[in-house]
Regions:
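ATP-binding glycine-rich phosphate-binding loop
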Residues: 25-53
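Juxta-kinase regulatory segment immediately upstream of eukaryotic protein kinase catalytic domains
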Residues: 1-32
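Detector for Asparagine
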Residues: 3-5, 37, 41, 63
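Alpha-helical protein-protein interaction elements
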Residues: 2, 31, 36, 108-111
Length: 130
């Protein structure tokens, strides 16, 4: 059995581990998983059973979340939490920002050696051209 390259830590982030991380926070993943574009981190749109998710914004899909897995050694937990706090502050001021979900009193979580956060899934909209 080969071991993942230590220079490529995301090689260990399998679809099964992504779904398990989401389910570990009490959401019921339905098996849908789509990788999204991200240069530094790994970001996925994950389907969840609607009854396991309470969205706070009407723009959010009721049956999907976005999971952002942070690159190891790039940012400290404090830096990530500062970014999350700022996004939550903007959301509280009713600015259009998808802030991280607060689950069990925190926005930053760990699973399988990876730090990650969950966000409401906001689909894109048509631009306002006036």
């Amino acid at each position: 059995m080969s071991h993942p390259d230590p220079e490529k830590p995301f090689a260990r982030l399998t679809p099964e581990r992504v779904l398990a991380a989401v389910e570990g926070l009490g959401l019921a993943a339905d098996g849908r998983l789509m990788a999204l574009n991200s240069y530094e981190n790994r970001v996925y749109r994950i389907g969840v059973e609607a009854e396991s998710l309470r969205v706070r914004d009407p723009r959010a899909l009721p049956n999907a979340v976005v999971a952002k897995f942070y690159r190891a050694h790039r940012w400290s937990d404090a830096q990530i939490r500062e970014e999350h706090a700022f996004a939550l502050e903007l959301a509280a001021a009713e600015l259009a920002v998808a802030a991280p979900l607060v689950i069990d009193g925190d926005t930053l979580h760990q699973a399988g050696g990876f730090r990650f956060a969950l966000f409401e899934c906001w689909p894109g909209g048509a631009p306002e051209l006036d």
